[in-house]
Amino acid sequence: MPWKAIGIFDSGVGGLTVLKEIIKALPQEDTIYFGDTARVPYGTKSPETVTRYSLEIASFLVHRDIKLLVVACNTASACALEALQQTLSIPVVGVIEPGARRAAAVTRSGRVGVIGTEGTIRSSAYAKAIKRINPEVEVVTRACPLFVPLAEEGWTDNEVAHLTARTYLSGLREAGVDTLVLGCTHYPLLKRVIGETIGEEVKLVDSAEETARIVAEILRGGELLRPTSEQGNHHYFVSDVPAGFIRVGNRFLGGKLGDVYQVSLEAEKE
C-alpha cells in the first residue's frame, strides 16, 4: 500500500496548485493527476452532475491503484466529497475542510473572509465548514470570477491584476476581516497581489497548502508514506486535447509538466 500513488483530480488546471504543494510536502510520493478538461468548468453544473463526474474520475484513478484521493476542486469538494467517501475504501480529502479549519484556528477577531468562484461562494461551502468548527466566527464572502482568467493568462502582477484585486477586495477590507481564505485553486498564483491589496495584517489561508498538510498527516498516521528518499514520479491525464493544459499547467505547477495523456472516461467504462 505505501508504494501506491496519490490520486488527484480537478475540472482543469487549478488543482495543479494543490499537486505542487503535495510534491513540496511529500517529494518521495508518486502522483496521478486527472484534469477533466472536456467538461470544465464544474461551477455551472448541477450538484448531481458534478457528483457523477467525480465518481467517474475516481473510478479511473482507483483502477490505477491509488492509496488516497485528493479532490483538488472546490466545486467537487462541495458537491461530491461525501459520495466519494461513502463509495471508496481509501481516504478521500477535499480542499474546503482543510482551509476552513486553518481559518478558524488562526483568526483573532473572529471575522474571516472567503474569496472564490461564483459557484463556490453560492454554495456557502466554506462558510458552513467554518461555522461547523466555530459557530462564533463571522464569515464574509466575495466571488472573484475574473481572478481565474487572470491566473490562466499569467496576468498575476500587472496593473489589471491590481485593479481587479482592489475592486473585489475593498469590501472585505471595510468589513475588517483578519483572515482571508483563498477558496479557489487558481488563486495561489495571485497571492502576492491579493496580499498587497488586502494588507499585511490579514492572514492569507491557502487551501492548497492546508490540503497538502492534511494529506501528509493521513499518510503518516496510516503508515502509508512511501518508504524511500527517491523523488516520486508524476503522471498526468486529461479528458480533452492536452495542449492548453500543458501551456497553462507549466505555470501553475511552477515547473515543466511531464507527458500528458488524453483519455476517454467513456471508453474506460467499457
UniProtKB/Swiss-Prot annotation:
Catalysed conversion reaction: L-glutamate = D-glutamate
Keyword Protein biosynthesis: no
Keyword Isomerase: yes
InterPro entries: Asp/Glu/hydantoin_racemase, Asp/Glu_race, Asp/Glu_racemase_AS_1, Asp/Glu_racemase_AS_2, Glu_race
Domain of life: Bacteria
Coiled coil: none
GO biological process: cell wall organization; peptidoglycan biosynthetic process; regulation of cell shape
Keyword annotations: Cell shape, Cell wall biogenesis/degradation, Isomerase, Peptidoglycan synthesis
UniProt enzyme class: isomerase
Binding site for substrate: D10, S11, Y42, G43, N74, T75, T185, H186
Active site per database record: C73, C184
Alphabetized Pfam families for the sequence: Asp_Glu_race
Cited PROSITE patterns: ASP_GLU_RACEMASE_1 (PS00923), ASP_GLU_RACEMASE_2 (PS00924)
Pathway: Cell wall biogenesis; peptidoglycan biosynthesis
Enzyme nomenclature, EC number: 5.1.1.3
Gene Ontology molecular function: glutamate racemase activity
PANTHER family reported for this sequence: GLUTAMATE RACEMASE
Family statement drawn from the similarity comment of this UniProt entry: Belongs to the aspartate/glutamate racemases family.
Function as written in the Swiss-Prot or TrEMBL entry: Provides the (R)-glutamate required for cell wall biosynthesis.
Protein name: Glutamate racemase
